[in-house]
Each structure stands twice: as structure tokens, then as C-alpha cells.
Amino acid sequence: KESAAAKFERQHIDSSTSSVSSSNYCNEMMTSRNLTQDRCKPVNTFVHESLADVQAVCSQKNVACKNGQTNCYQSYSAMSITDCRETGNSKYPNCAYQTTQAEKHIIVACEGNPYVPVHYDASV
């Protein structure tokens, strides 16, 4: 079974692209990362930084998660991210996404030993 850390990496890390030029990016990535297998995942964020840089956020600014848990961490610096949001005419299995690029601080939930990101909480 896929570990929580591996799942986070599959769903949220795309170090190979520093910026997204194609409006088709989300449609391609959401499919290739298996985020549209049994339903269209409504919202997903990809982070265009190295896995090591994203894992390092677990030792940065401790903040509360949206659900009230205290194991969330905000990155000290802004990171290059792409938000994928399902469009109104998207219908499974033909999931369709809007691609929006931004530079934002990311907030992730961390757990385990080693202490690594397991959930993408927000961007600020």
C-alpha cells in the first residue's frame, strides 16, 4: 500500500517544471498522477520545488491546520505552485481542470519518523 508520504509526493510534487506554460497542465497532470481514477478530485495543488525543499517545511513555522490539528507548518519562503480546480463542465470520467499558477507560502501537515509532509493544507 502506498505510504502517506509517497501519496503526498505523487499528488503534490512536480519538481520537473518550474513554471507552467500550458493551460492543459492540470488536465495532463491530474490524469497522469492518478487523481481522476475513481472520481474527479475537485481541487489539487502541485508544488514546483524539490522534494527536499518541501520536506524541509516540516521544520519551519508551526501553524494550526484548517481542521484544528497542530501539526501543520508554513514555508518561510514563497514557492512556485500550480492550483488545479475542476471546471463547471467537468464530468467524470472526462475531468476538466483550470490551471492557475502562483507564488505562495505553502502549509503542509507533517507526521511520522522521519517527519515528512503527508497532507497539503493550504497556500497563503
Swiss-Prot record:
Composition skew (Basic and acidic residues), residue ranges: 1-13
Reaction catalyzed: an [RNA] containing cytidine + H2O = an [RNA]-3'-cytidine-3'-phosphate + a 5'-hydroxy-ribonucleotide-3'-[RNA]; an [RNA] containing uridine + H2O = an [RNA]-3'-uridine-3'-phosphate + a 5'-hydroxy-ribonucleotide-3'-[RNA]
One GO cellular component, as annotated: extracellular region
Binding annotation for substrate: 7, 10, 41-45, 66, 85
InterPro entries attached to this UniProt entry: RNaseA, RNaseA-like_dom_sf, RNaseA_AS, RNaseA_domain
Gene Ontology MF: a single term: lyase activity
Assigned keywords, A-Z: Disulfide bond, Endonuclease, Glycoprotein, Hydrolase, Lyase, Nuclease, Secreted
Entry coiled-coil feature ranges: none
Enzyme class per UniProt: lyase
Highest taxon, organism lineage: Eukaryota
Record Gene3D superfamilies: Ribonuclease A-like domain
CDD domains assigned: RNase_A_canonical
E.C. code: 4.6.1.18
Cell location: Secreted
UniProt-annotated catalytic positions: 12 (proton acceptor), 119 (proton donor)
PROSITE patterns on file: RNASE_PANCREATIC
Keyword flag Disulfide bond: yes
Region described as Disordered: 1-23
Cystine pairings recorded for this chain: 26-84, 40-95, 58-110, 65-72
Alphabetical list of PANTHER family matching this protein: RIBONUCLEASE (PTHR11437), RIBONUCLEASE PANCREATIC (PTHR11437:SF24)
Family to which the UniProt record says this protein belongs: Belongs to the pancreatic ribonuclease family.
Quaternary structure note: Monomer. Interacts with and forms tight 1:1 complexes with RNH1. Dimerization of two such complexes may occur. Interaction with RNH1 inhibits this protein.
Function as written in the Swiss-Prot or TrEMBL entry: Endonuclease that catalyzes the cleavage of RNA on the 3' side of pyrimidine nucleotides. Acts on single-stranded and double-stranded RNA.
Protein name in UniProt: Ribonuclease pancreatic
Gene designation per UniProt: RNASE1
